[in-house]
């Protein structure tokens, strides 16, 4: 059952995406995710990364999308899962995804959906989906 501590964990997790941070990314990870945390975009063997890679990816947003914001639109809890529908927005400081999305100076706004598994009040696993195709269309328009 998801409790109040888990709700606080979820809100603290999303504070990581509202840059700039007041706390270190690694420090927040230590407080809100389990040591064996995984972040996944699918079920394939290369679709997940561990806690250290998550720290690297999120830290990278400080320079790649310095004004990034994540707004929680809806949050649902069931048993040991929390589902979040949110909106990610920002203005890339340069190209994204290895140059796939060139720098245009434009801002994007896309929907994101995350499914978090909670264990002991911390996030053990996240499945996430961001609509990066919509971002690409907005940035290239």
Across the structure, where does each feature detected by a protein language model lie?
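C-terminal and inter-domain tail/linker signature
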Residues: 1-141
């Amino acid at each position: 059952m998801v409790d109040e501590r888990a709700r606080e964990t979820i809100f603290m997790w999303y504070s990581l995406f509202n840059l700039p941070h007041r706390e270190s990314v690694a420090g927040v990870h230590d407080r809100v995710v389990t040591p064996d945390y995984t972040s996944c975009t699918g079920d394939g063997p290369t679709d997940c990364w561990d806690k250290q890679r998550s720290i690297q990816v999120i830290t990278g947003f400080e320079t790649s999308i310095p004004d990034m914001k994540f707004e929680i639109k809806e949050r649902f809890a069931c048993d040991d899962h929390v589902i979040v529908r949110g909106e990610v927005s920002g203005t890339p400081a340069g190209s994204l995804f290895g140059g796939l999305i060139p720098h245009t100076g434009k801002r994007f706004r896309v929907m994101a959906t995350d499914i978090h598994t909670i264990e002991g009040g911390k996030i053990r696993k996240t499945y996430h989906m961001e609509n990066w195709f919509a971002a690409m269309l907005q940035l290239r328009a």
